[in-house]
Amino acid sequence: MSALKMDDEQSLNVYMQEFRTRFINKSSDEMTSQALKESYKESAATDAWFKKYRDGELMIEKVLEFRNEITLQNKRIEEKQKNILQEAAKQDDHEQLKGELTERIQRLREELNQKREVALANRKANKERIKELQKSATLFKERLGLEIRKLRGDKLQFVFRCINPKDLDQPYSCIISLNAEGDYEVAGCDPPLECIAEFQEKIRETRNFSALLANLRKSFTALGSQVK
């Protein structure tokens, strides 16, 4: 009976040992499986967060690149605007200078036209005076032996004769002309007269051409009377 009891105890011990082993193995397997599950979950979560982190970094990089591109584009736009403003300023200066030159040219044209009109009027008046001189000269020629010769440049040469009693055909001449201002100029007297400047000033004041010719003849007559 005691032998049977020992066998039962041994059998119980063996059974308990096997149960303990199976329990430990099962617990270990369950723990390992749970650990693997937790590890997988943790790994999956880590991968998800890493992916989000990486996506965030990529997004930040793209944002920075986009911001840098915008900054660069803004600089280019500012440079273009600056260049455009400079060109516009140059154009404004050019237009202003062009306007000033146009006004100056217009003023010069007006002044030139005025001077041209004055010159034409003076020339017309000179021609009228020359005609009057020629008429007066005809009368003087008939009465006083005066000859009038037309020279180049609207100049007239007055030749007096019948002055020297010893030689009535001896010529005494003087050249009279009109300048651009329409004033008389007396020059080229042969023989020379000392009172030419006085006669010229007087004719410019009085416009009395007949008196000028009379004074010239008197001066030549006085000069001729001195000839022996």
Curated annotation (Swiss-Prot):
Could you list this entry's UniProt keywords, alphabetically sorted: Cell cycle, Cell division, Centromere, Chromosome, Coiled coil, Kinetochore, Mitosis, Nucleus
Residue ranges of coiled coil: 61-144
Main subcellular location: nucleus
Alphabetized InterPro entries for the sequence: Spc25, Spc25_C
Q: Where in the cell is it found?
A: Nucleus; Chromosome, Centromere, Kinetochore
Determine the domain of life of the protein's source.
Eukaryota
GO BP terms: cell division; chromosome segregation; mitotic spindle organization
Q: Name one GO cellular component term.
A: Ndc80 complex
| Family according to the record | Belongs to the SPC25 family.
Quote the subunit structure annotation. Answer: Component of the NDC80 complex, which is composed of ndc80, cdca1, spbc24 and spbc25. The NDC80 complex interacts with mis12 and zwint.
Q: Which PANTHER family match?
A: KINETOCHORE PROTEIN SPC25, KINETOCHORE PROTEIN SPC25-RELATED
Query: Tell me, what does this protein do in biology?
Result: Acts as a component of the essential kinetochore-associated NDC80 complex, which is required for chromosome segregation and spindle checkpoint activity. Required for kinetochore integrity and the organization of stable microtubule binding sites in the outer plate of the kinetochore. The NDC80 complex synergistically enhances the affinity of the SKA1 complex for microtubules and may allow the NDC80 complex to track depolymerizing microtubules.
Protein's name according to its UniProt entry: Kinetochore protein Spc25
Provide the species name: Xenopus laevis (African clawed frog)
